[in-house]
Each structure stands twice: as C-alpha cells, then as structure tokens.
C-alpha cells in the first residue's frame, strides 16, 4: 500500500496539490506511518523563482531533499518512503543516509543523459520532470543503481505516452520508454562500466530491474521472466487509437535502433 505526494502544480493533474508541510501538520503522514502505508514522493519544491527552480548550485529537487523531506523523516522515523524518479546526487545521498526505510526509483533517461543532451539541439523528447541534471548527478545515480550491495535503488520508468509532445504552447513533460525500458537500463549499465557478459554484472542488473523493488515493498517476486540479448532492436512509433502516435524516446532522439533487444 502506498500514497503518492505531488507538489502543487508540480505535474499534470496536480494543480490542487497541498504543500508538503501540511501533511506533516495534519497527521496524514503520521497515520500512514502507523498503518504501514508507503509515502512515494515527486521530490521537488515548487512555486520557486526561475533562478531557484534550476540553477547550477541548487534546484527544485535539491531544495526538497535538503529542506522538506528531512522534516518528515525526523518527525516520523518509521515512515517508509520511496523517492520516485530521483535525479540528483543530493537525493541519492539522502536515501543512503536514511537507511532501509527509504528507497528510490531511477528512470532510464536519468541514467543515460544529462541536461546537456536536452539543451544541445533542444531535444524536447528528453523533457521530463524532474529535469535531467548534471554529470555529477548522473554519476551518483549510476553508482547507486549499479553498486554490488545496492538494495535501496530500483527501476521506475515514469514513462509518459504523450501523443502530442510539443505544441506552440509548450512541451508535455515525460519520456516514453514503454516496451524498451529494460533494454535502455542495460545500455545504461554498460555505459556505467558494468560488464553484462559476466555473471556479476548480470546479477546487478537483475537486482535493480526485478528484485530490489519487490523486496523493498515486501511483495513476492514475479514468476514471469524475459531475456535481454545484445542484438540491435528497431524502435517504431506506437499507434494510440483515436489519439495519434506515441514516439519512444530513442526515436525522438533520432535513433531508429537500440543496442539491446528483449525475448519473452
């Protein structure tokens, strides 16, 4: 059982969200802790000025994990928390410091890319929230995901199938990785220096993709399986009846094939 916190105006459908502190004051988080309900967070501070929302020295996610979430951890140390779609070294450090009661998900795009990839050529298919960050952040995410003793970090795609990604009025936030996420995670692990031809590397990827999440939530592992094969796979647009087509992330970046394929 889990509940998701979205910051006010922080994402689609969150226009009427409450400030994080309100849930500390009104007893909601305390009741969740007492009942064993997990708090999942979209960890960003909103309502910020542009220079504070995304800056080299601080950003919306760092402010949330430095100033907001620690208050909940201090007030309710038994509350189980998942930092969803983590993007910063600051967030990684907090998860590690918090210990076993805190976990985190990481998306394929945040392991593969940085804000430089987004800005160079204005690659709007890489626009998601939280935004891609800097190389030191990607390095921290990669280290956390691929570590041999990792039990707190696990896969979470946050995939968003927008049929109309960019318009004259702005850009829909979210990267579509449905059906190709395991392949992209495998690519990210290899780029992080993990040899997936060896049993140790395979075990690290398997834990991140399939074991750490269920183990952290205390649910049974899936009995279904798939096999990743180092063979290029073509990426195609998906038809959504009555709405149009969805462009998978690699195709939006001009990549018609990805390095790994999947066998069910």
PLM regions: where:
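Residue-level detector of solvent-exposed, low-hydrophobicity positions
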Residues: 13, 49, 134, 160, ...
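Histidine/acidic residue-rich metal-binding segments in metalloenzymes
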Residues: 4, 12-155
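His/Asp/Glu-enriched, well-ordered alpha-helical/loop segment
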Residues: 151-221
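Active-site microenvironment of metallo-dependent hydrolases
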Residues: 190-264
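Glycine/aspartate-rich loop-and-adjacent alpha/beta segment that forms the canonical ThDP
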Residues: 9
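Short acidic/polar active-site loop segments enriched in Thr and Asp
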Residues: 1
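Active-site neighborhoods of metal-dependent hydrolases
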Residues: 106-174, 230-236, 241-264
């Amino acid at each position: 059982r889990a509940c998701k916190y979205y910051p006010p105006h922080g994402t689609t459908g969150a226009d009427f969200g409450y400030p994080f502190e309100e849930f500390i004051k009104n007893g909601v988080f305390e009741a969740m802790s007492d009942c064993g309900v997990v708090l999942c967070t979209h960890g960003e501070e909103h309502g910020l000025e542009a220079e504070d929302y995304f800056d080299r020295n601080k950003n919306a996610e760092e402010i949330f994990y430095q100033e907001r979430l620690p208050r909940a951890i201090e007030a309710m140390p038994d509350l189980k928390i998942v930092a969803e779609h983590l993007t910063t070294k600051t967030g990684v450090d907090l998860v590690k410091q918090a210990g076993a009661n805190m976990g985190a998900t990481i998306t394929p795009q945040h392991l593969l890319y940085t804000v430089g990839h987004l800005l160079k050529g204005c690659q709007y298919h890489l626009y998601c929230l939280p935004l891609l960050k800097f190389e030191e952040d990607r390095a921290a995410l990669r280290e956390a995901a691929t570590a041999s003793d990792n039990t707190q970090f696990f896969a979470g795609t946050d995939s968003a199938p927008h049929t109309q990604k960019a318009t004259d009025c702005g850009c829909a936030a979210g990267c579509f990785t449905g059906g190709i996420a395991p392949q992209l995670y495998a690519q990210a692990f290899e780029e992080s220096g993990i040899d997936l031809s060896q049993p140790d590397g395979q075990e690290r990827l398997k834990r991140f993709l399939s074991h750490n999440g269920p183990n952290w939530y205390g649910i049974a592992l899936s009995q279904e399986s798939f096999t990743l094969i180092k063979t290029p796979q073509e990426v195609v647009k998906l038809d959504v009846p009555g709405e149009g087509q969805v462009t998978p992330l690699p195709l939006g970046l001009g990549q018609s094939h990805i390095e790994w394929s999947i066998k069910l």
